[in-house]
Amino acid sequence: MAKKSMIERDRKRARLITKYAAKRKNLLVEIKTATSLEDKFNLHRKLQQLPRNSAPVRSHNRCTITGRPRGYFRDFGLSRHVLREYALQGFLPGVVKASW
């Protein structure tokens, strides 16, 4: 199980990403359409003044049960350990153990 502080930090990042998403997107569009170099620098400065954790690249996928950051399956939102456990117990409909 991941540390509670790491899980909470990722949740905080997710909240910041949603809060500043529109503002960040508008600034990026303005940067692309700006013609003068000075305008672009000013817009970049505004973009850099946004919180660092509001950038989507800083978020990390984590298992919803354990908070494990590695071995994450996007389709289920679970780590490989929990996915295997749930699949064997029949909690994931349509998921069966492979046999050939």
Swiss-Prot record:
Q: Does the keyword Transit peptide apply?
A: no
Gene Ontology biological process terms in this record: translation
UniProt keywords (A-Z) are: Chloroplast, Plastid, Ribonucleoprotein, Ribosomal protein, RNA-binding, rRNA-binding
Q: State what protein this is by name.
A: Small ribosomal subunit protein uS14c
How does this chain assemble? Part of the 30S ribosomal subunit.
- Organism per entry: Chlorella vulgaris (Green alga)
Q: Which GO terms describe its molecular function?
A: rRNA binding; structural constituent of ribosome
What SUPFAM superfamilies does the record point to? Answer: Glucocorticoid receptor-like (DNA-binding domain)
Q: Where in the cell is it found?
A: Plastid, Chloroplast
Q: Which GO terms describe its cellular component?
A: chloroplast; small ribosomal subunit
InterPro entries to which the protein is assigned, alphabetical: Ribosomal_uS14, Ribosomal_uS14_bac/plastid, Ribosomal_uS14_CS
* Biological role stated in the UniProt entry: Binds 16S rRNA, required for the assembly of 30S particles.
Looking up PANTHER family in the UniProt record yields: 30S RIBOSOMAL PROTEIN S14 (PTHR19836), SMALL RIBOSOMAL SUBUNIT PROTEIN US14M (PTHR19836:SF19)
Q: Which Pfam families match?
A: Ribosomal_S14
Where does this chain mainly localize? plastid
Family statement drawn from the similarity comment of this UniProt entry: Belongs to the universal ribosomal protein uS14 family.
